[in-house]
């Protein structure tokens, strides 16, 4: 996915993280909040997220090359919400999550563009058991039609608000 972020000064992954974490979570659209709340509720009931707490270290943390780990703005293995950081550079970061439904890697990047910046994200999913394929098949239409577009417009909105407050 690619999100166009118009205007603004230099943009980094860590800067966007700060912007996102400093924003009221209720500013995300109702449909996205509802689907995320439903997922968390079902995760608690069916214990879908328990494996992440049982296994505190990331499976891929040890695979991060030493030079990349040294350049990372936070140590590999740093918890970040439901995810574990593999590495963070100024313009790219990679996170990992492991639970009862998936073992996934989230890649995010920011690049300059003619009108501002582009924010990219991609998720790579590896099945962890027989539930992964049907689970991903069930949620995929909701992710693609509601969650991702909702997050994209939300990110654009909070970015533009920040640019406007900064005067440019």
What residue ranges belong to the model's regions?
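Hydrophobic-ligand binding "helix-grip"
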Residues: 70-113
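Intrinsic-disorder/low-complexity, polar/charged segments enriched in Ser/Thr/Lys/Arg/Asp/Glu/Gln
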Residues: 2, 92, 116-120
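Short, highly charged C-terminal tails/helix-capping segments
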Residues: 155-168
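A short acidic/glycine-rich loop-to-helix N-cap element
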Residues: 125-146
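Hydrophobic ligand-binding cavity/cleft-lining segments
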Residues: 1-72
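Short, acidic Gly/Pro/Ser/Thr-rich loop/turn segments
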Residues: 10, 102, 128
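Short acidic, glycine/tyrosine-flanked loop/strand segments centered on an H-E-D-like triad
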Residues: 109-131
């Amino acid at each position: 996915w690619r999100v166009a972020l118009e205007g603004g000064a230099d943009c980094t992954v860590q800067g966007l993280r700060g912007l996102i974490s400093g924003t009221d979570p209720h500013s995300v659209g109702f449909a996205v909040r509802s689907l995320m709340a439903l997922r968390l509720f079902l995760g608690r009931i069916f214990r879908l997220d328990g494996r992440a707490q049982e296994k505190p270290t990331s499976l891929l943390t040890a695979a991060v090359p030493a030079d990349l780990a040294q350049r990372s703005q936070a140590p590999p293995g740093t918890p970040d919400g439901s995810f574990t950081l593999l590495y963070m550079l100024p313009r790219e970061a990679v996170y990992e999550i492991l639970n009862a439904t998936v073992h996934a890697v989230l890649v995010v990047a920011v690049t300059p563009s003619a009108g501002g910046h582009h924010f990219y994200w991609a998720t790579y999913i590896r099945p962890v058991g027989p539930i992964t394929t049907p689970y991903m098949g069930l949620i995929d239409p909701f992710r693609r039609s509601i969650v991702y577009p909702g997050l994209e417009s939300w990110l654009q909105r909070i970015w533009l608000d920040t640019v406007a407050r900064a005067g440019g």
